Amino acid sequence: MTYADIILPVPLDGLFTYSVPAPMVGQVRFGVRVLVPFGPKITHVGVVARVHGKAPEGIAVRDLLRVLDTEPVVTATQYRLWQWMADYYMAPIGDVLKAALPAGLKAEEGYKPRTELYVRLRPEFGSARGLHVALDMIGR
């Protein structure tokens, strides 16, 4: 069985161990983002810190839900910096993760660009009177 230690954006010390389902074994590696269950109804996006084969003793381990990246979003150098920051400032590494990752990488779906919606009037609303009728229909 394969296990992964995950950095989660929660104010608790340490890493959280999850089991890696067989279909995901080739995808889970250091630095990729994963979606994991945390508590009864919450999911979090975390970063894989280590992949290993040692099961934690006396703890029920849950499965990873999904691998979000094909390439790592964190390098080994960045991770060492995060560890140093957590030690120096006596902060959980999850808080360092929250501060270090850009907002687009914290979401499950990744970066979502802002979009604008354009509306075009049908030809029958092309006149000034038709425009007023259309505006009245949508309630201004």
Regions found by a protein language model. Give the residues of each.
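Accessory, non-ATPase domains that flank or precede helicase/AAA+ motor cores in DNA-metabolism machines
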Residues: 1-140
